[in-house]
């Protein structure tokens, strides 16, 4: 027989090996976890430890209710779960299709009680070798509901109802699994595993391919602003942004030398054109994984920084997570376990301009080592802005089942990599006394915003089709809690500078980009270098 258990400030359901636990987690919010292990892990994932709040617990013969401000969760003896707002209106309910279940939400209150022989549970743990599980969680679909957020996907739809979204990081795709509903709730899938979220007409479904437990956070609010505020309180707010980031950023693939950078900056200054930031792209280094300037082309970085600052221009440099065997740092990083490993085959993650492996951003010591190297070779010259490119990271083949981080297999923890990459630089800058921290990062996960992330949409195509996709991508990134976001004006690849159609695209993209959080030029144009 199942049990409904009251705790001082939480409720639980137990049956066979499964434990379901609900507890208050911030204003008008609940954290919901389930496991088939003897106890829950201590992992917070995207969440921060909340301020203490006392929930109300109500019991009747068949249910336990946990009420925290404007949200209530009702849990019955069969383990079914539904959420309501302060007016008693149904927000969300699990989908069960069993002969013995009739639904705990609105369907139970109707005269037409519906049972099913499909044998589908609202929470499904499928055992995997090694003691982990493949998790599926199902919710009832609601007619007329609109859904927003979830990060950045290359598609034109702002309303995600009807969409199937891969929960994985790819170049131009950022999985930030927080969804906001027009019914007045927000839900964070608090799990960094590779998986899928499907918001179909018949039901919604979340899957994690490898995990130890189910973990999500749900909040209720009467407006998008209220829901977003509660989410930011739960996962972190971005640091104060310096005023200069709202100006023009000059960037391209690529400036090859110190002289090229200074020539462009001097011409802006001569024409009295305001310029906030100049960006030095990749391969200004001697080898991947050295994180320093090549002295042949960049003989005096300190003098370059000082001259740019005299013209009111800040300098940003690109930092890739790639490390090649020719790097003098490779042997130490490999020996210390600071590189991503492969479970099978050759340990090569990306073969762009060399066979490289990514440093393991989930490893605290690896993050510190990379920052210490960056501090010595960039920050100490006066460079305080960093472009964390390839931050997904971008594998040569996205065989997520083949790679392993310090934090665990990529299938289980992979989506946290861009957040941890950003955290290493945020922590390093904070330790040096910096408070206004903004770093350009080519990916995000839930909680990235608290590490000063300015996300951008990656290597998108130079076309009106792609341009249309960015409109939805940027809005949904903001609704997923990543407020600082930008694009490559005109798209990254495919633009012909001699084509009048591309001129039109570039002008329209510029006109729109003025109203984005950051106005940044970038692209791969002729002459190609």
Curated annotation (Swiss-Prot):
A Gene Ontology molecular function term of the record: hydrolase activity, hydrolyzing O-glycosyl compounds
Native species: Pseudescherichia vulneris (Escherichia vulneris)
Keywords: Glycosidase, Hydrolase
Enzyme class: hydrolase
Catalytic residues (positions): 389, 392, 459
GO biological process: carbohydrate metabolic process
Family: Belongs to the glycosyl hydrolase 31 family.
Alphabetized PANTHER family for the sequence: HYDROLASE, PUTATIVE (AFU_ORTHOLOGUE AFUA_1G03140)-RELATED, MALTASE-GLUCOAMYLASE
Protein name (record): Uncharacterized family 31 glucosidase ORF2
InterPro entries referenced in this protein's UniProt entry, alphabetically: Gal_mutarotase_sf_dom, Glyco_hydro_31_N_dom, Glyco_hydro_31_TIM, Glycoside_hydrolase_SF, Glycosyl_Hydrolase_31
Enzyme Commission no: 3.2.1.-
């Amino acid at each position: 027989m199942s049990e409904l258990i009251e705790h001082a400030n939480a409720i639980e359901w137990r049956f066979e090996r499964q434990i379901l636990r609900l507890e208050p987690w911030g204003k008008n919010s609940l954290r919901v976890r389930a496991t088939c292990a003897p106890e829950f892990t201590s992992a917070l994932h995207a969440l921060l430890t909340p301020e203490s709040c006392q929930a109300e617990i109500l019991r009747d013969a068949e249910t336990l209710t946990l009420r925290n401000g404007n949200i209530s969760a009702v849990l019955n003896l069969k383990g079914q779960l539904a959420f309501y707002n302060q007016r008693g209106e149904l927000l969300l309910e699990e989908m069960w299709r069993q002969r013995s279940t009739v639904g705990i939400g609105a369907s139970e209150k109707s005269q037409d009680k519906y049972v099913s022989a499909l044998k589908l549970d609202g929470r499904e743990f499928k055992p995997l070798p090694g003691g982990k599980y493949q998790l599926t969680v199902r919710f009832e679909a609601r007619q007329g509901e609109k859904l927003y957020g979830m990060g950045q996907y290359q598609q034109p739809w702002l309303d995600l109802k009807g969409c199937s979204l891969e929960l994985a990081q790819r170049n131009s795709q950022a999985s930030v699994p927080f969804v906001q509903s027009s019914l007045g709730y927000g839900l964070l899938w608090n799990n960094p595993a590779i998986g899928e979220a499907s918001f179909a007409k018949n039901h919604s479904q979340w899957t994690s391919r490898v995990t130890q437990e189910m973990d999500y956070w749900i909040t209720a609010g009467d407006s998008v602003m209220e829901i977003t505020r509660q989410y930011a309180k739960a996962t972190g707010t971005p640091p104060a942004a310096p005023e200069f980031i709202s100006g023009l950023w000059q960037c391209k693939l690529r400036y090859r030398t110190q002289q090229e950078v200074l020539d462009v900056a001097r011409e802006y200054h001569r024409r009295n054109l305001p310029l906030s930031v100049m960006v030095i792209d990749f391969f200004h280094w001697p080898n991947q994984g050295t994180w320093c300037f090549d002295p042949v082309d960049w003989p005096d970085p300190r003098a370059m920084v000082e001259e740019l600052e005299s013209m009111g221009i800040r300098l940003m440099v690109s930092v890739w997570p790639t490390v090649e065997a020719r790097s003098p740092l490779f042997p130490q990083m490999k020996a210390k376990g600071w590189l991503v490993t492969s479970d099978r085959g050759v340990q090569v993650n990306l073969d762009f301009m060399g066979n490289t492996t990514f440093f393991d951003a989930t490893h605290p010591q690896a993050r510190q080592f990379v920052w210490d190297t960056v501090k010595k070779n960039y920050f100490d010259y006066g460079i305080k802005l960093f472009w964390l490119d390839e931050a997904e990271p971008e594998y040569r083949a996205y065989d997520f089942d083949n790679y392993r981080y310090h934090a665990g297999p990529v299938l289980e923890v992979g989506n946290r990599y861009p957040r941890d990459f950003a955290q290493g630089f945020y922590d390093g800058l904070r330790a040096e006394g910096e408070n206004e921290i903004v770093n350009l990062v080519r990916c995000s996960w839930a909680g990235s915003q608290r590490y000063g992330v300015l996300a951008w949409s990656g290597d998108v195509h130079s076309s009106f089709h792609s341009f249309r996709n960015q409109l939805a991508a940027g809005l949904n990134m903001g609704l997923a809690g990543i407020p600082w976001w930008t694009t490559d004006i005109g798209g990254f690849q495919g633009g012909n500078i001699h084509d009048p159609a591309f001129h039109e695209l570039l002008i329209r993209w510029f006109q729109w980009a003025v109203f984005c959080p950051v106005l940044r030029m970038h692209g791969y144009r002729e002459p190609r270098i």
